[in-house]
Structure formats: structure tokens, C-alpha cells
UniProtKB/Swiss-Prot annotation:
InterPro entries: BolA, BolA-like_sf, BolA/IbaG_stress_morph_reg. PANTHER family: BOLA TRANSCRIPTION REGULATOR, BOLA-LIKE PROTEIN 1. Belongs to the BolA/IbaG family. GO terms for biological process: DNA-templated transcription. It comes from the Bacteria. Keywords: DNA-binding, Stress response, Transcription, Transcription regulation. The gene is bolA. Residues 84-106 are annotated as: Disordered. GO terms for molecular function: DNA binding. Transcriptional regulator that plays an important role in general stress response. It comes from Vibrio cholerae serotype O1 (strain ATCC 39315 / El Tor Inaba N16961). This is DNA-binding transcriptional regulator BolA. GO terms for cellular component: cytosol.
Length: 106
């Protein structure tokens, strides 16, 4: 499973205090059982002193093979331990997909 690979790679690379990988493919217009849309939350001191774009680059580099071959969309939420505590240990919810056949009528 792609989700297992993502979890292992992020865990190995960042030794996170907290790691959550959610397959959000069911929120999108893809076949049932797909593994194409993911949300990752990574809490690691490795992000200390880095701007969000630099943190996201590190995650993207870690998952380069999966992004090139399997993952269509990746929502990335990265925090230091202190930032995570300030967020009340919750990452933002992802919006429902409005792409494909799920577009709302206007």
C-alpha cells in the first residue's frame, strides 16, 4: 500500500514526534480503493528554523518516487513540537473535492 510506504519514508527521514498519513482519495472523483490523494501531518524538530516552503520541499524530496508515480495530490502540514502544541495538536481539515463530476452547480 502506498500509505504504508509514505508512513515509513516520513518516519525514517524525520523521526517525528507525531505522524499522521490520511488517504483522502475517497473525497475525490476516483475509483473506490484508490491511493492517490493524501494528507500528511508531520511534527518534527527537523523543521525548526525552516519556512513552510522549505519544509514542504523536504517532504516532497522524501516522497519524490511516490509523487512521480502514484500520488496525484499531497496536502502537507509540518510543525515543530512547539507549533504543534500551539495548534492544539490538530491539523486543518481538507476541503471536499469540487473537481470532476463533483463541481457544484453555479
Amino acid at each position: 500500500m502506498i500509505q504504508d510506504v509514505i508512513e515509513k519514508k516520513l518516519s525514517d527521514e524525520f523521526q517525528p514526534e507525531f505522524l499522521k498519513v490520511i488517504n483522502e482519495s475517497d473525497m475525490h472523483n476516483v475509483p473506490r480503493g484508490s491511493e492517490s490523494h493524501f494528507k500528511v501531518t508531520v511534527v518534527s524538530e527537523r523543521f525548526a528554523g525552516l519556512r513552510p516552503v522549505a519544509r514542504h520541499r523536504l517532504v516532497n524530496q522524501t516522497l519524490a518516487d511516490e509523487l512521480a508515480n502514484h500520488i496525484h495530490a499531497l496536502a502537507i502540514h509540518t510543525y515543530t513540537t512547539q507549533e504543534w502544541q500551539q495548534m492544539n495538536q490538530e491539523s486543518p481539515e481538507s476541503p471536499m473535492c469540487l473537481g470532476g463530476s463533483r463541481k457544484s452547480a453555479q
